[in-house]
Curated annotation (Swiss-Prot):
Source organism of the structure: Rattus norvegicus
Biased composition (Polar residues): 247-258
Cell location: Nucleus; Nucleus speckle
Top EC class, one word: hydrolase
Stated family: Belongs to the protein-tyrosine phosphatase family. Non-receptor class dual specificity subfamily.
Alphabetical keyword list: Hydrolase, Nucleus, Protein phosphatase, RNA-binding
Tyrosine-protein phosphatase domain ranges (all copies): 59-206
Quaternary structure (record): Monomer. May interact with SFRS7 and SFRS9/SRP30C.
Gene symbol of the encoding locus: Dusp11
Name of the featured protein: RNA/RNP complex-1-interacting phosphatase
Stated role: Possesses RNA 5'-triphosphatase and diphosphatase activities, but displays a poor protein-tyrosine phosphatase activity. In addition, has phosphatase activity with ATP, ADP and O-methylfluorescein phosphate (in vitro). Binds to RNA. May participate in nuclear mRNA metabolism.
Amino acid sequence: MNQWHYGRYSRGRDFTARAPPKKKGKNQIPERWKDYLPVGQRMPGTRFIAFKVPLQKKFEAKLMPEECFSPLDLFNKIQEQNEELGLIIDLTYTQRYYKVEDLPKTISYIKILTVGHQVPDSGTIFQFKSAVKEFLKRNKNNDKLIGVHCTHGLNRTGYLICRYLIDVEGMRPDDAIELFNRCRGHCIERQNYIENLQKRRVRKNQNASASRSGGLEDSAHLTEQVHTTNKPVNKGPKKSRRGGHLESSQHVQTQSSAYSFRKWSQNQSVYQRGFVPPPGPAGEDYSQRRFFWSMRPNGSQATHHKKWIAASYQRPFYPASWEWNV
């Protein structure tokens, strides 16, 4: 029996006056979902873009018009950035938010069931890296993006993107976290995720170290100083309703047991006071400058639209056991 699927969570005796939490309905808006920007910006030097989970039409009755964020809205917002989405990696631990059929057929979709609050296990990390590497290998002659989301597009999403940049691209942990925070418009909140990333050792034999040499192209975004406040949220991992591990082949769920190819965006004016500012001023030539990381409050609120391509993405690796059905 697989503990992942059949484990049960017991509240035990409750000696407080609090009523037990109500079971969430299928059409309930995810908790705190409204607090986050729908879509971030492309992370310079990478193919990554992060966003919160889009919600299908049945949720719209409980949202104001300006709060709605559907798969179609996602497509439009990424097009507004003059970008093209090639792959969605869905990290939510449910199937209720939207259907794969709602996505354009030109976009690939991969679901990696990832439990919230706790640091993703090695199987989940391996699947994420493998999916990214395979996509990059198959799309090395174009500039399509990899969109990653969990519920809020922040903690699980930020952890796995940063983990890839650290382990595969050789970026320093603090640099990866800082880059993600700036481009997402929010900071990774969970302290256990941050601490786990900061313990990672940078591989010294990378051909292109993203945070030290030519792995990432220099940009106003990377040289701009930014003030980041990573406030802990529930420092330790919460007890999961489901425990144990799931084998790699069971983690990935796709339509018809294959990766369906499907295609997709962001309004930069939605950055608000209190969020991490978007990339720095456009129109300046930083080609001769070496980027660095430092801390300063009140970073620039300007945006830019330049694309950044990392040379390291021309050297993908992928295990022979992986299958990608077209």
